[in-house]
């Protein structure tokens, strides 16, 4: 998910590619077609995953490029809303959108986006990366709880069904777990 190019040095550029099918909140509600497809994710998650992958590699996320493929049925106001959402999310993460592409094609059934994130390596990350491969006995650090993303995703997608078996506060809380996605504070 994350790559460092050339030799390791402080301030080195690191890239991360994160792709996903984007859920559009629009009148055509194209997302309903693939509601059960777990690769379908909101724009927020694409950017957050990119930022998290960069942070996990020891880089500070600074910029991103966004490529969006749209079906012919998507209207310009929906594209503007999608880009506005992307700009807002990037700003929250202190990431500058520095470019990208938008393509419309009859071959596309629902919006697809790929974000390429760029980060700058810190001196500590350079030292760690220069040390070489991960070795037996090294620790794996988990900053959140296992199943966080899946719980939030499934609760949001299946809210109606879950409400028939569980109290509303429990389902709503699980669906809101996306607020914990960022690992940027822990990676700092």
Report the location of each language-model feature.
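Helix-biased detector of long, well-ordered alpha-helical tracts
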Residues: 1-188
């Amino acid at each position: 998910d994350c790559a460092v190019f050339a030799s390791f040095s402080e301030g080195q550029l690191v890239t991360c590619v994160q792709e996903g099918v984007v859920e559009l909140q629009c009148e055509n509600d194209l997302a309903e077609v693939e509601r059960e497809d777990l690769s379908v994710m909101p724009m927020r998650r694409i950017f957050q995953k990119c930022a998290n992958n960069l942070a996990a590699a020891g880089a500070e996320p600074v910029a991103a490029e966004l490529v969006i493929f749209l079906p012919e049925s998507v209207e310009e106001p929906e594209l503007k809303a999608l880009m506005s959402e992307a700009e807002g999310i990037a700003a929250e993460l202190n990431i500058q959108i520095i470019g990208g592409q938008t393509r419309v094609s009859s071959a596309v059934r629902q919006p697809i986006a790929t974000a390429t994130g760029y980060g700058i390596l810190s001196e500590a990350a350079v030292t760690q990366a220069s040390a070489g491969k991960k070795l037996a006995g090294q620790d794996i650090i988990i900053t959140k709880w296992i199943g966080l993303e899946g719980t939030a995703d499934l609760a949001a997608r299946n809210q109606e069904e879950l409400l028939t078996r569980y109290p509303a506060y429990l389902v709503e809380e699980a669906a809101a777990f996306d607020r914990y996605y960022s690992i940027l504070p822990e990676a700092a």
